[in-house]
Amino acid sequence: MITVKLYGLLRIESGIKQKQLEAESVQQVLDVLCALGISQKDLKGCTILVNGNSVTKRSKLKDGDTVVLMSPVAGG
C-alpha cells in the first residue's frame, strides 16, 4: 500500500489530504488522482517526492512508500 499526501492547491481543490492506494509507479498514482477528479493540468506542474526524494513520473514504487505531491508556489 502506498500513502499519497497532497499539499497546496492540490489539497484545497481536491479535498484530499491523504489517500492510501495500490500503485507500482508514480504515473499510476497520477492516473488514480485524475480518476478522482484532479485535472492533469494541476498535476503536471506539481513537485513529486517519494520518501522525501525528488522523482519523476516514471519512478517505481514499493509497498510502504510515501508519495508527496505539492502544487507550485506563486506569489511575491
Spell out what each predicted region is.
Residues M1-A74:
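Ubiquitin-like/PB1-type beta-grasp interaction modules and other compact soluble beta-rich domains
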